[in-house]
Protein backbone atom coordinates (compact mmCIF):
# COMPACT_ATOMS: atom_id res chain seq x y z
CA UNK A 1 0.00 0.00 0.00
CA UNK A 2 1.31 3.44 -0.94
CA UNK A 3 2.02 6.20 1.54
CA UNK A 4 -0.74 8.76 1.96
CA UNK A 5 -0.30 12.30 0.62
CA UNK A 6 -0.83 15.27 2.87
CA UNK A 7 -0.67 18.55 0.95
CA UNK A 8 0.73 21.60 2.71
CA UNK A 9 -1.08 24.72 1.49
CA UNK A 10 1.06 27.32 3.32
CA UNK A 11 2.46 28.81 0.14
CA UNK A 12 -0.94 29.61 -1.28
CA UNK A 13 -1.15 31.93 1.72
CA UNK A 14 2.41 33.14 1.04
CA UNK A 15 1.28 34.33 -2.39
CA UNK A 16 -1.71 36.10 -0.86
CA UNK A 17 0.33 37.78 1.88
CA UNK A 18 2.92 39.01 -0.64
CA UNK A 19 0.35 41.57 -1.83
CA UNK A 20 -1.88 41.79 1.23
CA UNK A 21 -4.90 40.71 -0.80
CA UNK A 22 -7.76 38.35 0.00
CA UNK A 23 -6.74 35.97 -2.78
CA UNK A 24 -5.69 33.27 -3.41
CA UNK A 25 -7.68 31.71 -0.58
CA UNK A 26 -5.86 28.78 1.08
CA UNK A 27 -9.21 27.34 2.15
CA UNK A 28 -10.32 27.07 -1.47
CA UNK A 29 -6.94 25.58 -2.34
CA UNK A 30 -7.31 22.95 0.38
CA UNK A 31 -10.66 21.87 -1.02
CA UNK A 32 -9.19 21.56 -4.52
CA UNK A 33 -6.38 19.42 -3.12
CA UNK A 34 -8.88 17.13 -1.42
CA UNK A 35 -10.89 16.77 -4.61
CA UNK A 36 -7.67 15.92 -6.47
CA UNK A 37 -6.92 13.05 -4.10
CA UNK A 38 -5.01 14.47 -1.13
CA UNK A 39 -5.64 12.39 1.97
CA UNK A 40 -4.95 15.26 4.33
CA UNK A 41 -4.26 19.00 4.46
CA UNK A 42 -1.28 20.41 6.36
CA UNK A 43 -0.88 24.04 7.35
CA UNK A 44 1.57 25.82 9.64
CA UNK A 45 0.31 28.68 11.79
CA UNK A 46 3.57 30.44 12.53
CA UNK A 47 4.01 32.80 15.45
CA UNK A 48 4.80 35.65 13.04
CA UNK A 49 1.73 34.82 10.87
CA UNK A 50 3.85 35.17 7.75
CA UNK A 51 1.48 33.06 5.65
CA UNK A 52 -1.39 31.15 7.29
CA UNK A 53 -3.63 33.32 9.50
CA UNK A 54 -5.82 32.31 12.44
CA UNK A 55 -8.94 32.91 10.36
CA UNK A 56 -7.71 30.52 7.66
CA UNK A 57 -7.55 27.71 10.20
CA UNK A 58 -10.94 28.54 11.69
CA UNK A 59 -12.62 28.64 8.27
CA UNK A 60 -10.91 25.51 7.02
CA UNK A 61 -11.52 23.22 9.99
CA UNK A 62 -15.26 22.51 9.41
CA UNK A 63 -14.95 22.33 5.62
CA UNK A 64 -12.29 19.65 5.23
CA UNK A 65 -13.53 16.20 4.30
CA UNK A 66 -10.17 14.55 5.06
CA UNK A 67 -7.96 15.55 7.97
CA UNK A 68 -6.37 18.77 9.17
CA UNK A 69 -2.74 18.48 10.23
CA UNK A 70 -1.95 21.74 12.02
CA UNK A 71 1.74 22.51 12.49
CA UNK A 72 2.54 24.62 15.53
CA UNK A 73 5.41 25.77 17.72
CA UNK A 74 5.39 24.51 21.30
CA UNK A 75 4.10 27.72 22.90
CA UNK A 76 1.24 28.48 25.27
CA UNK A 77 -0.46 30.61 22.60
CA UNK A 78 -0.40 27.86 20.00
CA UNK A 79 -1.45 25.14 22.41
CA UNK A 80 -4.45 27.24 23.45
CA UNK A 81 -5.34 27.81 19.79
CA UNK A 82 -5.14 24.08 19.04
CA UNK A 83 -7.41 23.36 22.02
CA UNK A 84 -9.93 25.79 20.53
CA UNK A 85 -9.77 24.42 16.97
CA UNK A 86 -9.25 20.74 17.83
CA UNK A 87 -7.76 19.60 14.51
CA UNK A 88 -7.50 15.86 14.01
CA UNK A 89 -3.71 16.12 13.98
CA UNK A 90 -1.24 18.56 15.52
CA UNK A 91 2.43 18.41 14.56
CA UNK A 92 4.80 20.27 16.85
CA UNK A 93 7.63 21.89 14.90
CA UNK A 94 10.61 24.08 15.80
CA UNK A 95 10.35 27.72 14.86
CA UNK A 96 12.79 30.60 14.54
CA UNK A 97 11.68 34.03 13.34
CA UNK A 98 14.65 34.54 11.01
CA UNK A 99 14.35 31.25 9.13
CA UNK A 100 12.86 31.11 5.63
CA UNK A 101 11.39 27.69 6.32
CA UNK A 102 11.70 25.10 9.08
CA UNK A 103 15.42 24.35 9.12
CA UNK A 104 15.61 21.24 11.28
CA UNK A 105 13.75 18.91 13.56
CA UNK A 106 12.33 19.69 16.97
CA UNK A 107 14.83 19.15 19.79
CA UNK A 108 12.67 16.91 21.96
CA UNK A 109 15.66 15.80 24.03
CA UNK A 110 16.60 19.38 24.91
CA UNK A 111 13.09 20.48 25.95
CA UNK A 112 11.61 17.17 26.99
CA UNK A 113 9.30 18.28 29.80
CA UNK A 114 7.86 21.14 27.74
CA UNK A 115 7.14 18.91 24.75
CA UNK A 116 5.76 16.12 26.92
CA UNK A 117 3.35 18.49 28.67
CA UNK A 118 2.17 19.95 25.35
CA UNK A 119 1.69 16.49 23.89
CA UNK A 120 -0.38 15.36 26.86
CA UNK A 121 -2.46 18.55 26.87
CA UNK A 122 -3.56 18.15 23.26
CA UNK A 123 -3.96 14.38 23.47
CA UNK A 124 -6.43 15.02 26.29
CA UNK A 125 -8.72 16.95 23.92
CA UNK A 126 -8.54 14.31 21.20
CA UNK A 127 -5.73 15.55 18.96
CA UNK A 128 -3.36 13.00 17.46
CA UNK A 129 -0.01 14.63 18.25
CA UNK A 130 3.09 14.16 16.11
CA UNK A 131 6.58 15.55 16.56
CA UNK A 132 8.61 16.82 13.60
CA UNK A 133 12.10 15.48 14.31
CA UNK A 134 15.33 14.51 12.63
CA UNK A 135 16.01 10.84 12.00
CA UNK A 136 18.03 10.60 15.19
CA UNK A 137 17.51 7.65 17.51
CA UNK A 138 17.80 9.76 20.67
CA UNK A 139 15.10 12.12 19.39
CA UNK A 140 12.89 9.18 18.44
CA UNK A 141 13.30 7.69 21.92
CA UNK A 142 12.41 11.06 23.45
CA UNK A 143 9.30 11.27 21.27
CA UNK A 144 8.22 7.86 22.53
CA UNK A 145 8.81 8.93 26.12
CA UNK A 146 6.65 12.03 25.51
CA UNK A 147 3.76 9.78 24.60
CA UNK A 148 3.49 10.99 21.02
CA UNK A 149 1.90 8.27 18.85
CA UNK A 150 3.30 9.72 15.64
CA UNK A 151 6.50 11.33 14.38
CA UNK A 152 7.29 13.11 11.16
CA UNK A 153 10.87 12.70 10.03
CA UNK A 154 12.55 15.77 8.56
CA UNK A 155 13.73 15.02 5.02
CA UNK A 156 15.35 18.41 4.40
CA UNK A 157 18.96 17.24 4.54
CA UNK A 158 18.14 14.50 2.03
CA UNK A 159 16.36 16.95 -0.27
CA UNK A 160 19.14 19.55 -0.04
CA UNK A 161 22.07 17.15 -0.49
CA UNK A 162 24.46 18.47 -3.12
CA UNK A 163 26.03 15.17 -4.13
CA UNK A 164 24.71 11.68 -4.78
CA UNK A 165 26.90 10.38 -1.97
CA UNK A 166 25.43 12.85 0.51
CA UNK A 167 21.90 12.08 -0.60
CA UNK A 168 22.41 8.34 -0.24
CA UNK A 169 23.86 8.81 3.24
CA UNK A 170 20.86 10.91 4.26
CA UNK A 171 18.47 8.39 2.72
CA UNK A 172 20.07 5.60 4.71
CA UNK A 173 19.76 7.65 7.89
CA UNK A 174 16.07 8.18 7.20
CA UNK A 175 15.51 4.49 6.45
CA UNK A 176 17.18 3.50 9.72
CA UNK A 177 15.12 6.06 11.62
CA UNK A 178 11.87 4.91 10.03
CA UNK A 179 12.60 1.25 10.72
CA UNK A 180 13.58 1.95 14.33
CA UNK A 181 10.54 4.11 15.03
CA UNK A 182 8.15 1.66 13.39
CA UNK A 183 9.66 -1.20 15.40
CA UNK A 184 8.78 0.78 18.55
CA UNK A 185 5.17 1.12 17.46
CA UNK A 186 5.20 4.71 16.20
CA UNK A 187 3.29 5.89 13.16
CA UNK A 188 5.97 7.40 10.92
CA UNK A 189 5.37 10.25 8.50
CA UNK A 190 7.98 12.24 6.59
CA UNK A 191 8.36 15.51 4.76
CA UNK A 192 10.25 18.70 3.89
CA UNK A 193 11.82 19.58 0.57
CA UNK A 194 10.31 16.65 -1.31
CA UNK A 195 9.53 17.03 -5.01
CA UNK A 196 8.91 14.90 -8.09
CA UNK A 197 12.65 14.46 -8.64
CA UNK A 198 13.49 13.10 -5.18
CA UNK A 199 10.26 11.58 -3.86
CA UNK A 200 10.61 7.99 -5.09
CA UNK A 201 13.29 6.65 -2.69
CA UNK A 202 11.45 8.13 0.30
CA UNK A 203 8.01 7.00 -0.83
CA UNK A 204 9.41 3.50 -1.37
CA UNK A 205 10.19 3.05 2.35
CA UNK A 206 7.43 0.61 3.32
CA UNK A 207 6.87 1.79 6.90
CA UNK A 208 6.19 5.43 6.00
CA UNK A 209 2.51 6.16 6.57
CA UNK A 210 2.17 9.66 5.11
CA UNK A 211 4.24 12.19 3.19
CA UNK A 212 3.56 15.88 3.75
CA UNK A 213 4.50 17.95 0.72
CA UNK A 214 3.75 21.57 -0.05
CA UNK A 215 6.18 23.94 -1.74
CA UNK A 216 6.94 21.77 -4.76
CA UNK A 217 3.26 21.03 -5.39
CA UNK A 218 2.32 24.71 -5.21
CA UNK A 219 5.28 25.55 -7.47
CA UNK A 220 4.23 22.92 -10.02
CA UNK A 221 0.67 24.24 -9.90
CA UNK A 222 1.83 27.47 -11.55
CA UNK A 223 2.46 25.43 -14.69
CA UNK A 224 -0.11 22.62 -14.60
CA UNK A 225 -2.82 23.76 -12.19
CA UNK A 226 -3.28 22.76 -8.57
CA UNK A 227 -5.39 19.65 -9.07
CA UNK A 228 -2.99 18.22 -11.63
CA UNK A 229 0.04 19.04 -9.47
CA UNK A 230 -1.51 17.07 -6.61
CA UNK A 231 -2.34 14.18 -8.93
CA UNK A 232 1.20 14.10 -10.34
CA UNK A 233 2.67 13.85 -6.84
CA UNK A 234 0.16 11.24 -5.75
CA UNK A 235 0.95 9.14 -8.83
CA UNK A 236 4.67 9.33 -8.08
CA UNK A 237 4.08 8.19 -4.50
CA UNK A 238 1.86 5.32 -5.59
CA UNK A 239 4.38 4.18 -8.20
CA UNK A 240 7.17 3.95 -5.61
CA UNK A 241 5.90 0.75 -3.94
From Swiss-Prot:
Name by which UniProt lists this protein: Pyridoxine 5'-phosphate synthase
Catalytic activity: 3-amino-2-oxopropyl phosphate + 1-deoxy-D-xylulose 5-phosphate = pyridoxine 5'-phosphate + phosphate + 2 H2O + H(+)
Gene3D superfamilies: Aldolase class I (3.20.20.70)
Subunit and interaction comment: Homooctamer; tetramer of dimers.
Annotated binding of 1-deoxy-D-xylulose 5-phosphate, by residue: 10-11, 46, 51, 101
Function: Catalyzes the complicated ring closure reaction between the two acyclic compounds 1-deoxy-D-xylulose-5-phosphate (DXP) and 3-amino-2-oxopropyl phosphate (1-amino-acetone-3-phosphate or AAP) to form pyridoxine 5'-phosphate (PNP) and inorganic phosphate.
EC class of the enzyme, as a word: transferase
Pathway assigned in UniProt: Cofactor biosynthesis; pyridoxine 5'-phosphate biosynthesis; pyridoxine 5'-phosphate from D-erythrose 4-phosphate: step 5/5
Gene that this sequence comes from: pdxJ
Superkingdom: Bacteria
Short name of any one Pfam family annotated for the protein: PdxJ
GO BP terms in the entry: pyridoxine biosynthetic process
Localization annotation: Cytoplasm
Active-site residues, record numbering mapped to chain: 44, 71, 192
Membrane-spanning intervals of the chain: none
Binding-site positions, 3-amino-2-oxopropyl phosphate: 8, 19, 193, 214-215
CC terms in the record's Gene Ontology section: cytosol
GO molecular function, one term: pyridoxine 5'-phosphate synthase activity
Family, per entry: Belongs to the PNP synthase family.
Keyword Transferase included in the entry's annotation: yes
Enzyme Commission (EC) number: 2.6.99.2
Lineage, top ranks: Bacteria, Pseudomonadati, Pseudomonadota, Gammaproteobacteria, Moraxellales
Alphabetic keyword roster: Cytoplasm, Pyridoxine biosynthesis, Transferase
UniProt-annotated site: Transition state stabilizer, residues: 152
Amino acid sequence: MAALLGVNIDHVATLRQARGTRYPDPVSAALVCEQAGAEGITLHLREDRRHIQDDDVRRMRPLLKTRMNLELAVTDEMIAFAKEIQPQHVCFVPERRQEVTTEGGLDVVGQFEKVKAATQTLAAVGCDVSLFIDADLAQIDAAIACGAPTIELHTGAYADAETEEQQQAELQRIIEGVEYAASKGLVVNAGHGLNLDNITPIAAIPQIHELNIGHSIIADSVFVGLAQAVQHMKAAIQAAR
